A protein has these predicted regions:
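Single conserved hydrophobic/aromatic residue that forms the stacking wall/gate
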Residues: 1-16
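Conserved G/P- and acidic residue-centered "switch" motifs that form tight phosphate/ATP-binding loops
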Residues: 155
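Short, intrinsically disordered, charge-balanced linker/junction segments flanking boundaries
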Residues: 5-6, 249-252
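Generic extreme N-terminus detector
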Residues: 16-17, 53
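N-terminal beta1-alpha1 cap of cysteine-dependent amidohydrolase-like domains
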Residues: 22-152, 163-170, 174-214, 220, ...
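Hydrophobic, aromatic-enriched interface-forming segments
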Residues: 158-161
């Protein structure tokens, strides 16, 4: 039993040894090509971890709201991404489902991190803690770390990512570390306040350049012991760690 196939012009003829078969039109190869101008590169979706607050007295008094700072949204937009605010309650409900539609996550600033996550009891100098927010962030953060998803931390976000990787923090810089620098500036937050030294060979140095840079400063906690695969990329003149990244490129 044999099958033969022949192509004549734009027609293909298929026959078997018994004489059965069919003839049909064949589209030219060019018909299957996609025009270059029709291809669109999808913008990366960046999930921004949300926080909550209760409204002031009034019509909606005590109503709990989820929020994401507009600065984070604008920064993602200005750098070619699509920002997606992630409610805290959703982080615990389905972290993998949320991350399935994200290309990276941004962990923002916020209140002090619960020291239980790095094996300590709260010291007298610790400020506001939001246990429900920390629980939600860690649910999403652990899933993102397991998936190898890129993560960018800002302020509390840096401290969170370090603890996520097994590191710990100074609960209060001024009582646990020698320092001559005011890290919690009284100036409006957009003003530059002190200097940091960005280390050669780091990803941060590739972006901003190694050496001395002026920054603002709004924190009283800081990374103490770097976590697994964590690289210190910038320090203040008093040795306080101001920026970190991971050696595997996941924490940027």
């Amino acid at each position: 039993y044999e099958i033969s196939c022949s192509l004549v012009g734009s027609e293909m003829c298929i026959r078997d040894s018994a004489g059965s078969g069919f003839t049909g039109k064949v589209k030219p190869f060019s018909a299957y090509l996609v025009k270059k101008e029709s291809l669109q590169v999808r913008k990366p979706i960046i999930g921004i971890l949300g926080n909550t607050y209760k409204t002031q007295p009034g019509l909606f008094s005590s109503a709990e709201r989820m929020y994401v700072n507009s600065d984070y949204i604008e920064s993602v937009l200005n750098n070619g991404g699509i920002p997606m605010a992630i409610p805290a309650v959703a982080m615990k409900a389905d972290p993998e489902g949320i991350l399935a539609v994200c290309d990276g996550i941004l962990v923002p600033g916020g209140e002090d991190l619960n020291p239980w996550y790095y094996g300590e009891e709260p010291k007298p100098q610790i400020q506001t803690i939001r246990p429900e927010i920390d629980e939600a962030w860690f649910a999403l953060g652990r899933a993102a770390k397991e998936m190898g998803m890129p993560m960018l931390g800002i302020c509390k976000g840096i401290q969170f990512l370090n603890v996520l990787c097994g590191g710990d923090l100074y609960q209060d810089i001024y009582t646990q570390k020698e320092t001559t620098i005011l890290h919690l500036q009284s100036l409006e937050r957009s003003y530059l306040h002190h200097h940091v030294e960005i280390k050669e060979g780091t990803h941060l140095a590739e972006i901003l350049g190694a050496g001395t840079h002026a920054v603002n400063s709004m924190h009283h906690q800081a990374v103490r012991t770097p976590g697994e695969d964590i690289v210190v990329s910038a320090t203040a003149p008093d040795g306080t760690i101001e920026a970190i990244e991971s050696s595997n490129g996941q924490i940027v």
